[in-house]
């Protein structure tokens, strides 16, 4: 076959774009669920909103744990999917389900035994702690179901089954918003439960999500066939070793990033109330644009793993080049959309003149950042990591975020006393520090690692 810069495989595009669109919509709906919770609790009381936000700091770490153990599964399983070998995929999935189950039980016990210590780490306000305690008391039981659900969805994604995740997100949005509206405010004859109502809504949604995906895997799925044999219950020592080698760097990288996020938010939070408001508004729009980038990263990981599994090195390189160019194009489009809609978006808020001006400046900064982020994240976490090189992303994240960005941002904010836009530029500068090494690594093609074992 003649070598080409872009992939000419029609099946590649037929598989890529449905993945990208469906995962984008799923991410958008999931983000909207969180937004709806915040809006309804914010309208009920500030303490309820703050209490839920406090518990969500804990849940954010759990979400990232689910993402990283799922990503480790996808990296290996998608390569076996490229070879159409289902038994190793079922074995790896079974092993990761056991990890998720043990982690979920541990988290429930931790939150049951030490709720005060966990919540007290974030605030000393007794009113907020009381609301957070009521929320955590109910929500903690969803941690196990959430982790298991996400592992099952990751296994399905590794074999290019993503529509069920979108359907689940849609159902979860409707159920969660409906129950929250009913129980938070006490509508339709139900008692007014406030933050406890929000927790009950989330718990019911999580139970429903688990039931739907479990029934789908058992009764409907025709690819994974998870329980068609006893492979899911068998732990192969070699496969376990392969998973650990892949998942540990992914886990460390994900957790380091997850810990850095609230630290970056805290830096702006200690500058001024206008900075908090401006960052909140600008970040909301940025996150909505980011769902496409996250989807591209997820889709790229599956596509690259599948390509490497097939063993056609020329097609792997062509597919990677195609994806990287698409990443740059998507970044420029998203950045332009964010920039040209800033006036309309700002008109939806009532902010002080200072906060409005600051928000506009931050949106412009984030529109520019979007271009870099839309390249480095899908290439680094999608193409390179999806093709089997999980250690490189760990090194890049450690050095750029913890070695450069956080020290630079802390110095800019509290030592050099730079203006808030300059501090935000420092906080977002990891897109530059990550972008160059990721580009150079990408061009070397040393990231193509075969992870599958011969039959």
Q: Where do the protein language model's features map onto the residues?
A:
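Short alpha-helical transmembrane segments in multi-pass integral membrane proteins
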Residues: 1-23, 77-144, 192-247, 304-370, ...
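Hydrophobic alpha-helical transmembrane segments of integral membrane proteins
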Residues: 15, 30-31, 63-65, 71, ...
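Residue-level hotspots within pore-lining transmembrane alpha-helices
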Residues: 25, 29, 33, 62-66, ...
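Helix-terminus/linker motif at the lipid-water interface of multi-pass membrane proteins
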Residues: 28, 32-50, 119-126, 182-193, ...
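Alpha-helical transmembrane segments of multipass membrane proteins
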Residues: 35-39, 151-155, 178-185, 214, ...
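Small-residue-rich hydrophobic transmembrane alpha-helices
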Residues: 49-109, 146-165, 278-342, 373-396
